[in-house]
């Protein structure tokens, strides 16, 4: 049974990693970022809930 020739694996793996690195660099470099991002303040709206309007007794006093 012939053995698997692994002598070219290192070259294959290194070339694949280099190719992936170059492709990702090209993909990232084409992405456009806004030069001056502005913060938009978000306004929280307070919702009226029934327990905020009236106080209710939730326990019995100790006797």
Curated annotation (Swiss-Prot):
Topology class, membrane: Single-pass membrane protein
InterPro entries the UniProt entry points to: ATP8_mammal, ATP8_metazoa
Membrane-spanning ranges: 8-24
Natural source organism: Balaenoptera musculus (Blue whale)
Main location group: mitochondrion
Gene Ontology CC entries for this record: mitochondrial membrane; proton-transporting ATP synthase complex
Assembly description: Component of the ATP synthase complex composed at least of ATP5F1A/subunit alpha, ATP5F1B/subunit beta, ATP5MC1/subunit c (homooctomer), MT-ATP6/subunit a, MT-ATP8/subunit 8, ATP5ME/subunit e, ATP5MF/subunit f, ATP5MG/subunit g, ATP5MK/subunit k, ATP5MJ/subunit j, ATP5F1C/subunit gamma, ATP5F1D/subunit delta, ATP5F1E/subunit epsilon, ATP5PF/subunit F6, ATP5PB/subunit b, ATP5PD/subunit d, ATP5PO/subunit OSCP.
UniProt-listed GO biological process terms: proton motive force-driven ATP synthesis
PANTHER family in UniProt: ATP SYNTHASE PROTEIN 8
Compartment annotation: Mitochondrion membrane
Modified residues (N6-acetyllysine): 57
Name of the protein this chain belongs to: ATP synthase F(0) complex subunit 8
Domain of life from the UniProt record: Eukaryota
